[in-house]
């Protein structure tokens, strides 16, 4: 049996809560590897804006902090959570730190890469837009700002 993205379970960024991604079945998802000390970190603002705009229509952003690229994330989850909340007002779900390369790579991101044919997570803030059926609709690199995804998100929400 092949795993789907809904078969994955991850610990939330703070606290002991573990969340199964089945909770997000039938939603349009934007899955992003994030970092608090990166030149692309201001994208948190755009990600939160998308989440606020579309969450009532069945859209969710899922953030996965990572220090895989130049250690650009805090080592303590609480610092990451505070940074995101204080500086960018982040309310979308954030999960515990994940590896984005090597043998310990987050299995969800391995699956997302496989679906898109991309070879690797190239840097922080790689984005995967996932349809309600759980398939990757499109991959966006770090340089693509969240605001540029609005028409694709609306298209998927209207399906």
What are these regions (language model features)?
Residues 23-29:
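Proline/glycine-enriched tight loop/beta-turn segments at coil->beta junctions
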Residues 40-105:
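Structural microenvironment flanking redox-active thiols in thiol-disulfide oxidoreductases
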Residues 20-22, 52-53, 117-121:
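Surface-exposed acidic, glycine-flexible loop patches that form ligand/cofactor-binding
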Residues 107-110, 114-159:
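Thiol-/selenol-based redox modules, centered on thioredoxin-like
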Residues 29-31, 62, 128:
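Conserved hydrophobic packing residues within short motifs/helices of P-loop NTPase cores
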